[in-house]
Every structure is written in structure tokens, then in C-alpha cells.
Amino acid sequence: MAKTGAEDHREALSQSSLSLLTEAMEVLQQSSPEGTLDGNTVNPIYKYILNDLPREFMSSQAKAVIKTTDDYLQSQFGPNRLVHSAAVSEGSGLQDCSTHQTASDHSHDEISDLDSYKSNSKNNSCSISASKRNRPVSAPVGQLRVAEFSSLKFQSARNWQKLSQRHKLQPRVIKVTAYKNGSRTVFARVTVPTITLLLEECTEKLNLNMAARRVFLADGKEALEPEDIPHEADVYVSTGEPFLNPFKKIKDHLLLIKKVTWTMNGLMLPTDIKRRKTKPVLSIRMKKLTERTSVRILFFKNGMGQDGHEITVGKETMKKVLDTCTIRMNLNLPARYFYDLYGRKIEDISKVPLLEKCLQNSITPLRGLLWVSKGEGFSPSGAKMYIQGVLLALYQRLKSAKKYYKQLNLVMNEQKEKITEKVILSMTAKEHHKEQEEVSRLIDELQTAIKSNIGHLCKLGPQLQAEQEQFSSYVYQHIKSLPANTLVPGGLQLKVFENGKNTGEISVGISKKDLGSDSPIQTDHMMERLLLKIHQRLQGSSINPPGLNYSSMRLFDENGQEIKNPLSLKNEQKIWVSYGRAYRSPLNLALGLTFDRVSAFARGDIMVAYKTFLDPNAVLLPGCGNWEVCEGFPINFNCTSQQIPDQFEKVDLENHFLQNKVDPNIVLHASVSIGKWSFSGSEASSRSQIAPSILWPVASVWLITKTGMILSRAITQGCLAIGHPIRVKAAEGTSLEGYKLILQKRHSGDDSQKWVFGTDGCIYSKAYPQFVLTYLEELNAQVDVTQTEYHIHHGAWTTAHQEHGRNLAEEVLQESASNLGLKQLPEPSDTHLMPEGSLEETGELTVALVRKLEEKHPKASAQRWAIKHEGTSKPGQWKHSRVENPLWNKLTYMWPVLPSGQLNEEFDWPIQGLLVPSSPPMKKPICKTTEPYAPVRLRVLQNGEKNKNRSVTILGPDISPGRKTQCTEILNLPSAARRLYNEKGKEIFALKDLQRDELVYVSCGELWINPDLSIAQQKKQIFLRNLESDIAKIQIFCSTHKIEALVLEVQSDIVSGSKLAVHKPVAIFGEEKQVTEPEEKQMQEDPLTTENASSEILDSHVRAHLRMKACHTLPRYAWQETSHDFDEDDSLPKKTEKGLFENVEPQKKHSCSPKHSKLHKHCHQQFEYRDGQIISHAAPQLVLGVQGPNLRSGMEVVLVEKKSDGSHQRWIHQEDSRTFHLVSNPDLVLAVSMTKTRNEVCGYPVIVQKYKPYNNGAANQKWHYMKNIKALVAFHSTALDKEITSANYAGVCTSSVIKEENIDQPGYCYLSPDGKRKTMLCLACGQSMRTEKGLKQLLPGVPFLCISGTKTQKPFLQGPFKVISVAEVDLSCDKAEKTLSYYQARLLSLRMKTCTQAASHSGMAATHQKAVKIIAYKNGDGYRNGKLIVAGTFPMLLTECTEQLGLARAASKVYTKDGTPIFTLRDLVLWALDESFLQRDSEKQKQDAAPVGKEQIIVEKNPRMKVKNRLFAKSVTSDSLDGIDKSLLTLILRNPIAIWVSCGEPFLPPNALQKAEKLEKQNWLKKDRILADLDTMRHKMRQLKGRRVAACQPATMVPTKSPVQPVVVEGGWTEQTQQEIKLMELIRHTEAHLSEIQEMESKINFPIATKRIAVKPSNLYKQPNTKRVWIYLNGGRPEDGTYAWGKTISELLQDCSSRLKMTHPARALYTPSGEPIQSWDDIERDMVICVSMGHGFKTPKELKQLMEIRANYARIRRQQGPQATDIVVSPSTKLLSLAHLHN
């Protein structure tokens, strides 16, 4: 019963709920008659339902209605609650722009957590959906329902009471939900105290594009005060616009949905509402601007009439259209020209006509026709093909149209039974008539088009006939054939490296077309093309060039010489590319160890240790565990008593040695030296390889410990230590004390093994703090041999001397038996017979411990060091270094101490790395900015231009970004402008030296071309250059065609990664000595042979030149015999002469003895071929292989570690072809890379190369494995094969090697134009003309003779030579050397003639001038680094000076020591005569003590004139030297004449630099003394003050008669004593004197040769004179202005005129307010200035009014005539009457 009652009760409640819901819907309809829902409407619904009905008793329909309404409102109106008074806990809130609401504040007890909140809701019978009820606790809580808040409100009334009390206690806070104006989706919760902060927060949180300015409530009312905003209200924030109702769009949308119905046919819109027309977003003007005016054009390939391409072309340049056609039509070359139907070139794409209307196939009109050419001429066959196809199509359409027209006529004739087209029968009469007119019009159009195309075909008749007669040559009529004597250089294969690196090789192929130009003889243009080609190839590579700027690109060879002529490049040459920077060697200097084998022999109790040969098999055991460091020579060494060897080098027995633990008889001695090391690998080349030595891979790596020890990474038991004292002689003659560096066994308490790293980059010795580690080679210092150990080296003595040396050593040992304390061998009695340089180890020391130099010493960098990380362990160590100079981080250098001098604890100690000398300064260099120049107007001309009227005016320097391209673009130069010259040919470096409107010549980098020079002389120079290039090819062939037997060997150490090469075998080394003498005799006979060979083709005049040159060149230093017989009156300093003539001695290169070299190389040349691998016999774990996954031809073969599965290290030996094929790629074989410049030391490198299956021309791929001696012999082939291979690599035609014989060789072929004859070319000829003809490579097995060498060759087949004819060159085995000598003599003859003609302009022939000995110095260097030059002509003197002095540009000026400019050798000889007589007269004047009178003063003022008059009074004039006694001239000219050479800069006296340095040093010493005295006086002052204060003596009271101050205090400890007062005055006087000295120092301007701008003192607080301002025209807007610079008002006015492009010069300046500027002081930096041409100040508004007045005036005169403006103004009658009354 109870259950039934409960059910009845529930049913009653359900009925009541339905009734309540019905009432709610009625309320809804009444409140919203339009059926829309908004926030105000839904509010009473929720209140009505939730207040009167518990949700537990709601029916399912009611719950569904509430949930649907809730979800709808949630999605439409945002996440905020609908009722503003809903209960929300204090901690609840919304994150910015979030759709989730967080739980309530956990710090309060109202709602503890989310679980309690859910349980309360469940107990209160508030229904929650299953998806939300079953959500995990960690998931974010969704938007809370309004029903849940309401239930919470009913449930916890007590909590609400507490909450309201809390609100009463809190201050007034604006807590709202802010929405973007007009939106309900972009919102944020904001809590702020004021309206201003509310606007700021809303600007940031709502991401408004402008600052928030206004706040609106939900009803649209604007809130101005915080009290206007209710708590927890919804507000709308705008940026200034009025309120936008966000519900308006929703309301309209709901209204539209109400009136729209769904039907079976789709959506039905209301019929009573008129649909408005859709308005476009863009305006008509914007549509015109944005729409793309493009046309469709029909393109065909040249010579084709089918497969056309319709390409849409817009308003683009012709170049872009050509590029589009190249891509769309898939052309193999870029498109160059467009031709129309008649073969005319199209220059404007917009003028292409439309096709006939009947040929249009779309609504968009089609234009055409155009034929695309790749550079060839127009081919009419393509137009013919197209017209024939069009005519065929037109005839078919005309036939069908006429047939259809007949069908239409049958209707008119009422013959419907004959009509076959059913469409016609269904037409009405009107449609029939219209169709008949259209078909008739179509027939007329077709007939007209047919007639037009037939006419086109008739006009093409002559062109078609010419093409049929001339075949394919018709389209190449515009190409002119080159003369027979010109030839573009052949192809090159270059190996490009990045500057400063020797890895990352990039192979670049350069063909003849890449270097070709309209004038092939222009090397400058070819160089530009070469740079561009290399730059394009490097794009995207590891070198990564910056952008497209290749104007600063520079190329260098292996020697660091810049490459400026592409003709000097050779195939397979290595080059280094740089972008604007100087050459950096890929090998870097580092401190390392060199190990030498040591042996000993004993006789009696005396033992002598000496260096001997190394046994590589025993020594190559790197690692600390195999060696032990011994202090002194090992005792357990088995000494020998054999005879002393012919040459030996003694080693001190007290040194530390390395002894092998396995074999005690293997003892090594380590030497410390500087070597060249590659950071990228273990490759090294020691600079001081005294004896054959072995460098371990880690011999240059050191470990720096915290205690200051520097340990060797190779031998960790040994450390860097101080050796015996030495004395070092610097280049300037000064002697420095020092100590030798050695490797010792480490001891923790030894200070001589500890080092201190300073904050200046120096490494100090702890035992001798005043000495630092020094790189001697940079210091240009040599070790004084008298203070070092003694070494004997008899290798260069004769046999008698060797025997004497052996006996002498035996005597030494016998005499030493009685003296056990003797430690060093005595010096032999005949040491003067020993060759210079025999004291080799200490004489060539590269590093030592030397006394610290001054900080400003020019060679101070020799004592700076850096640590370069090496190895794979501890990477990134350099990042912990703390050095101010950013260059250290760029070079990844590190230093172990901080700038404060403390150890850097951030390092992972010990530090491992290389010790690099000559490091950059540790402090950041101070960059001085140069003063900006004022703009100068110049007239520019292209280099060599003769017509000065073609000059163009420019303004320079321009500040715009395009300033560098001004001259390039205006003069239309082929490449970027780089150098400037004046009218006299002097190069310009600074524009400040130029005058206004001065004429300047612009070049692209080449030297100045004299406009007066004849073209014939230029052609002669070009001919000589081409002839030299041809002779160079022949010379390369002659040096390589007789390739001797070469074997495979390892270049450096036998370690993994070592490179391989082919070199002379050690087995035939004994024969070299026998071969040497005949070669020397042959070399001595060569000049005679050359002279005899040239006598047939040279005239007597040139033969005399040749003999004279041979006399000077054969005895290279013939003048040295008399070089020491100088007179006392010599003009050069004695020290300079001594150093100079000592350096002239030829430097003898140290070479190892034959026996030692044989043992050293024997293991490097032994290999075994076993199990498909080529194994090193010395190290069986290493085999030949190729590194890298991507195999390609040209990769180097190196030693790699042996692996069983390595396919890149297995080879297949094919004995029939004598080749070794790589297993991973059988097309690649082991080959020798035949570079054109063979390295005699390293030989030819070994690479993998694509297999060439030819009988001849592939000798570098043929090998012979000699199993008995374990050697691989290269070039194992016939002599003919070697000669053809050498010819191919030298670029010589093979027909000059073999005469009238067909052989199998690599080559090319091409077909004749008629396709009947096949022409065959060799490899060199084919590469030289590959781009001109369609060459195809010949298959193997086709014997042929190159067509270039036959007598029936065509004129254009010049071959690989530029000048020489291939048919006239005979390079067969026995005539190659004679041919080379013949052409060399011919080249020499032509050069002599050219030099003679060039020197004839001075009035006397060059042959009449005797060669003069000259000492050349660089201008500004004083007497440093002089070079001896013997020259016969002045141009030869300038050339030699440029090369030997290493000048950056060509030498152009020569000065003597007194500044006299020299222009010819005759002037130099005359000056030398004058100088010699001047010195003799001065000596006589000193001897004759005459009274000083007026005459003597006059003579002293001009002594040279007096001597000249005395010398040449009778016998000689200034234009001739014939009258001078030859013996006197020879006596004077026996000593070299000192000259100073410059590149155009003015003369600097030789002693100016020394004087400046001396004066600076004196000032420094003087200032140091003053500072020391000042410090002493200040210290004394402090002492006096301290004593006075410490004494605390009381003051005395002295009575006075003054009533104001009856007692005066005197004395006491607070008053200064008289001594202190005097000392203070002295201190002030000294400080004033010091400031005067410093001020004088700042004003001194030292002359420096390399700088043109004097060093000026820079003051931090002094503003520069030049000011930058913002200028604009008078009457204009300031925004339209620009910047201007100036030092004065006049200069600023001039700059304003040029920058604003004013029609008249600027005359007045105003401020923006209209105030005139009169003084320069009124102008400030970045000031806005109005510029006027003389008129008064005008604002933009006034200027506009003035323009309107002028426009009205002109309009009236145009419309009503000139008389309309003839206005006479007269006073009014009223004014006249008033004036009359007044009178």
C-alpha cells in the first residue's frame, strides 16, 4: 500500500510538472512573440521550473527540455552562467578564453572538492548525465549547469549567508566576465579595482588590435564608473565603436529557421521575404587593380608545327616569358627568341595578334602564333607544318558546314523528307532563320581563314626553298665562324676547397663554353665567367657561399697565390675559394714532438750517443705502455764498438730518452718543434725534421693539468720542461737569452716542468717567470750556435774530408779516455770546411723559452698561444673559455685561466688539445671608425675609353644600398666595378682626394689601360699569352710522357686514413747517383742547346739579347764574389748589408742520406694482394679502401682498417687487363691521378676511376703486382699507351704524338651536316670543341687518327692549341724536346722584341743599358727585408720588384733614399754617380777645415747641383752616359743601388719609422719615470699624513684682541704641516707636467707606410662635426623627406639639393614651425628641417591653396580666353565718397 501510494504521488507530481511546463511555454510565447530565445526570456523559465518543482520528480520530457535548453544556451551564449545572481563559490573562476570552469576554492569549507560536490548533487536528487557522472577525477570539469548552482543555492543557505557577510567585508572589486564587443565567443574573466585597469586587462586578454576604450553592460548601457557594473556581470568591451548586440544575429537566425521548411525537393525559403542581391566585397576600382590581365598564347618549338603549348602570360617581362616557355616546353637550353609566322623577332609580347575567330577554342581569346628559339634562326618548316594542319582542319569544317547549310535550305524548299538532321525538324521558323545566318557567317569565316593561310604559305615559299637547299645550316646563318688562329680554352676539372680547409673537396667541371665570350682572348671576361660557374656549383654545398654575391670571390692555389688568369689553371688542380678574405693555409701550426732513433758506440770508458736510422717495423708502436722514459741514456743498452759512420749527430747523454720495453736496444729521443698540423686529421708536416723521424698521431696533443704541467698525450710519463741555456739572435741584430725546450720524465716537485698561463696569452715558466714560450720563426730569430750543443754533419764533405773526420773522431775518443769528465766533443780544427747549416738541430729551432717582449713589440704575437681542442673526448670544451676577443670563439680556441688570472673551474680537467702559436690577442680590439666623406660629383668613363665626351656624371659616395652598383649599371660594365683611376693612371683609394667634376676611369679589376695605347700592342700581348699557354701544354707533355717505373707507397705514417701515392721505388735508389751526373751535364748544356736551336729563327739583335740574358742567368749569383769588397763610403748601413748578403746564399735543402731514406721508405712501398685485399706489409691490419658510402669516380684511396665484410676494400685483379676493380662497383678501378703539376716529394695520388677499356690512353689504370718483392708497379703498359695517356692529361692532340697511324684510343666523333661523313677527334680536341658540335663518345675498339693533325683538316678545327698548328707540332718520342726548345726560343724572341719596342719610347734602346744591381725595399719599411734584383730595363725592374717584394698591386713608382723619383734606369745610374761624388766631396770638406762663409752655405744648400756641374761639365750630359769613363762607372755600380718601391703612394723616408719608434720609446720612458716619481711622492704624502694623525698632538690656543674671535686654534694633528704643503705643490706640478706630455703624445702623427689616414686622438665626449638631419621640401610633408649630412650650412644645403633632386639650389632652412635657421649651432642631430629654394616658409595647406589659385587662373584663361584675366581693380564708390568727405 505504501508503495502504491508513493507511485500515485509520483504520478501526481508528473502531471503537475507537465502543467508547469505548459505554463512555462505559454510564458515563453507571451514574452517572446516572435519565437526567439534570449537571455532575458530564458531567465524566468529557469526560475519558474526550478523554484516550483524538484528535479527528482520531473518527467523525462521536462528533463529533456531543460537539458536541450541548457545545452543550446551553453553553445550559443558562451560558458558563463545565465543568471547573474547564481551562487558561485569565491574561488571559482574562468581561465582566459577557456571553456572549463574550475572547482571552488579549496581553502574554504563550503565545497571541499569535486567529489563532495558531486555527492551533494546526487543526494539532492540533481540529475547529472552518465558521461559526466562517470568521468575520472583527473579529467577537467566541464561547464557547470545553472540547475546545479540553483540546487546548491537551495541546499546551502547557511553557506550563502557566510558568503554575503564576507562580501560585505571585502573592498569594492570589479569582477566581471568580459566579452569582445559583438561576440560571445571571445571572453575572459577579469578582476580589477578600477575601470582603467579593466580596460588594460581586457586589451591584453581579449587580444584586441587596439586599446580598449569603452565598457558596455548586457543591455547596451555604457559603464563609466565601477559602481555602474554589477558583481559577476557580463560586460562588452569595445575599442571605441558603439555597442553591438551579440544576440541580434542569433535572433535573426532563429526567425529565419522558423520560416524555413524542409520538403522533398530540399530547403524551401519563405516566399514573402524578398531575397536581396549579393553585394561583392571588393569595389570596382579594386577589382580592376587586382584582376590579372593575362592572355593565352599558342607556342611551338622552332621547326615544329604540332604539339603546341597554350601558355597563359600576364604583364611580365620578356625574360620571364622566355623562362616560362623553357620550363613548360621542357627545353634542354634556355629559350632566347620568339618568332612570328614570317620569322620576325617578337620584342613585345602584348602585340601578338589574335587567331582567327574560327580557330578559337575557348571563351578566353587565343593569341599566336609564336615559335620559340634557343638561339638559332627561324625555321619556316614549322610554320609550313602548322599551316598544312590548319588547312586540313578548315577544309573538313567547311565541308561539314556546307552540308549542314544544304540541310537548312531543304526546309525552305519544303523538302523535309530529304532532311537527315533531326534537330532541324524540331526548329521553329525563327530558330531556323537564326541558325541559317550563323552557318552562313561560319562558312564565310572559314573561307576567309583558308585564303589567309594559303597566303601565308605562299609568302613562306622563298624561305622554305632556302632551308631545303642549305639543310640544317640555314638556322645558324647568324653565327660567325671564329678566325683560324683563335681557340677558346679546353675543359678543366678543378678540385675546390673552402679557404682554410683541406677537406670537403668539391669537383667543378669547366667547359669551353663556360669560359667562352664574344672575344675569347679577353682573360678578364673569362675569369668572371669562371668565378660565376664555380659560385653556381657551390650553391647548396658545404662551403655555402653568401647569397648571390660573387663579386668578392677570390681563388688561390696551393702556394697561396691568387689566381687571376684562367689560362694558368690546369686539369685536376686544387684551388681554394674565398669570399673577400685573404688566403688561409689549410695546415695549422702547432707544438709537437719529433722522435728520432738513437744509437751509441763506446771505446773504453767513454760512450757517445748519436742519431741513426729508424727501423719502422720496431718503432711504429704508439702507446704509453710500450715505452719507458729514462733519465739519461739507458744503462742496459748494448753499445757497439764499430767504426764511426760517415755522418752522425751527437746527442747529450744526460737527456731523457724513450726505451722500448720489448726491445731495450730501441731507444728514441724526442725533440720539441713546431709543425704544420691539420685539425681535421692526423696529417702533419714537421718544419724541423732533422733526421728521418716518425710522428705519432697524438705527438702534437698535450694534456694541461691544474698543477701547471704540460704532459704529452703520446707519452704521458713525459712532460714539457726547460733545457740548457741558449742565445737567440733576432732579425734586427739584437741578442736574447733563452732556454731550449725538451721532453723530460715528470716530477711533481720540479718547477722547471711547471708552467703558468697568463692573462695575456703567454705561457710563463714557473722557474723563470720572466721567460715565456716563444715561436722563433715568427720572431725571425736564429739560435747562436756558439752557445748550444755541438753536432757534426759531414754529409756534404768530400771523401778526403770524410776520412779526416773519421780519424779525428777516433782521436777524440782516445784523448777522452784520460778525461772522464768530458761531456762534449771538442770542435775540430777544420770547422771552416763544414758547410753552413751543419749545426742543424739548434740552428733550426722553431720554439724556445725567451725573455718576455714588450706588449707593443711588433713581434709580440710570437709569444701568444692558444689551445685548440683535439680528439673525440670532452667535446665542446672551448665553450667554457672566457676570453674577451670574439675571434677566439670563432676559431674554437680556449684558455685555461679567467681574465682575473684564476683557473677556470668550468673546464673538465685535464684539458686536452694542441698548442697553437701566434694566437689573436685575448682582449677585444678597438675599432676606430673613419670620418665620413662628403658627397663628390664625378665624371666616370670605362677603362680605356678614348672619347671623353662619353663620360657620365654620378654622385659619390652614395649612402643608398645600391652605391656599389652605380658605375656598374650606368657604364654597363660586364662585371662589378672594382678599381678607380685618374687621368694619369694613378689608382684612387679615397674619394676625399678628388675634386668636383674630376674625370675618373672605372675598371672591373684590371689594371689601367692607357687610352693612347694602340690596338696593335694589345694584340701582341694577347698573342704572346696564347703562345705561352700552348707551350705550357707541350712542356707538361714533355715532363710526363716518359714516365719512369713508379710503385705504390704510403705518403705519411702507416695509420688508418693515410693517403696513397706512386713514387720512385727504393730498389733503384742506388742508380740515382749514377744518373744524376749526366742530368746535371745535360742541364748545363740546355742553354747552349736553346741558343743553337734558336739561332736558326732569331736575328742577330735578338741573339745578342739571348746571350746577355744567359750570361746573367747561368751564374745566378755572380756578383757575390765581389759583394764583400765594399768601400767605407758605402751608402747602406753595415748591418743591413751583412744580413742581406748572408741571406742571398742559396739555401741548401736538407735531404736524408740514401741509406736512411731507403730504410724509411721500404715499409711504405710493400703491399700484398691476398684474399681480394691489398694489405700493407708493415701493418697487416690496414688495407687499401675507399671511405664514404657514396662512391664516385675521383675519390682518393686511403688505408682503412681491415674488415671481413667491407666491400669498399676488396679488389678484383684482372691480369689480362692489368687492372684492379672494386668489388662494390666493378666499373671503378684503381688508378693514378695524373695532375698537371706533379709533386716530386709526394708523387701522384692514387684514386678510383671509371674503367677505360681502351688499348691506349689508360696507362694510369694499369698495374703489375710483383709478388716476390711485394710491390705494386704503376703505369705497367707500353710506351705508346703512356704517351697517349700523357697527351690526354696535358691537353695535347694525339696526332702530334703518333704520325699517320690509327690506334685504339678514347675520343669523340660527329657527323657532317649531310650525315654521310663521320669525323673523329681525340680526347683533347674533343674537349676543346665539345660545346660547338654534337659530339658523341667513341666506343672502344675503333682505331682512328685525330682529324686535327691531318693536312686535309678544316680551318675551324684548330685543335687544343690557341696559336700553334697541330699539324706542325711533332711530339714523337725523339723530337718532343726539340719541338719544345724551338717554341720556347720563339717565345723568347718575340718577348725580346716586344720589350725593345716598349722601351724605345724613352729615347734610347733597352739593349744599350747595361744591367744594374739594385737592392729594392718596400716604401715605408726602411732598410728591412731588402731584395737583390738585377735588371736591364725599367719595366723589368718594376715587374721583379712587384714579385719579390710581394706587393699587393703592381709597382709604379721608384724613389732613392733622398726621395728623388726615378723613371728610367739612366736616371738611377746618374743619381748613383751624383751620390758617390757627393760623399767624396763631403769627406774632403771634413778634412779641409775651411772657415764658414757665405759661399759654403750656398754649396751646402745645393751640393748636388755643384757636383753634377763638376762631373758633367766637359764630357757628359744628362741624356747620355757615353762620356763617362767605363772603369769609373763599373767601380761605382759594383755595389747595388738602394731604391724604395711604392704602388703609387708618396715617398716615406727610410729612417722615419725608426725615428717615430725611437721618439715614442723615449716618451714612454719619460712618462714612466714621471709616474714612478709621482707614485713615490704620493706614498710619501700618505706616510706624512699617517704620522701626523697617529701622533694626535694637541692644538695651541692663541689669544687675540678681536672681540669676535678672542681665541685662535693653531697647530694640532688636524692641520697640515709645512712639509706636506710643499709636497702637495710638487705633486700638482708633476701631474700638470704629466698631462702636458700626454697631450703632446696625442698630437703626434707617426708616418706609417701602409696607412694614408693619420692616427687622430678620439675623444669620447667630443661630438663629430658632421650632423645628420631629416629634410623635406618647403610646402611638403615631413614624411616624404630623407636624410642629409653636412659639416657646415653650405655643405648641408648642397647635400639637400642633390638628395631632394631640387630644380634650383637650396638657399634657406626652416624649422617645422617656420623659424629660419641661421647658425650651424642651431642644428641638432636628427633634427627635422624644411628646405627652401629661396621662398618663404609654406605649410602644405598654403602650398595647396597656391596651387589651386594657379589652377583656377589657368582654367579661366583656357575656358574664357586670355582677356578673362585682364582684371582692373578700382575702389568702390562708397570708399571714394568717404575719402572725399574726409578731404
Swiss-Prot record:
CDD domains: beta-trefoil_Ricin_DCDC1, DCX1_DCDC5, DCX2_DCDC5, DCX3_DCDC5, DCX4_DCDC5, DCX_DCDC1
SUPFAM superfamilies: Doublecortin (DC), Ricin B-like lectins
Name of the featured protein: Doublecortin domain-containing protein 1
Classification via InterPro entries: DCDC1, DCX2_DCDC1, Doublecortin_dom, Doublecortin_dom_sf, Ricin_B-like_lectins
GO molecular function: carbohydrate binding; microtubule binding
Entry-linked Pfam families: DCX2_DCDC1, Ubiquitin_DCDC1
Record Gene3D superfamilies: 2.80.10.50, Doublecortin domain (3.10.20.230)
Job of this protein: Microtubule-binding protein which plays an important role in mediating dynein-dependent transport of RAB8A-positive vesicles to the midbody during cytokinesis.
Compartments where found: Midbody, Midbody ring; Midbody; Cytoplasm, Cytoskeleton, Spindle
Disulfide bonds: none
Entry's Gene Ontology cellular component terms: cytoplasm; Flemming body; microtubule; midbody; mitotic spindle
GO biological-process terms attached to the record: cell division; intracellular signal transduction; regulation of mitotic cytokinesis
PROSITE patterns in the record: DC, RICIN_B_LECTIN
Chief location of this protein within or outside the cell: other
Assigned keywords, A-Z: Cell cycle, Cell division, Cytoplasm, Cytoskeleton, Lectin, Microtubule, Mitosis, Repeat
SMART domains linked to this entry: DCX
Compositionally biased tracts (Low complexity): 117-131
Record domain Ricin B-type lectin: where: 702-800, 1151-1266
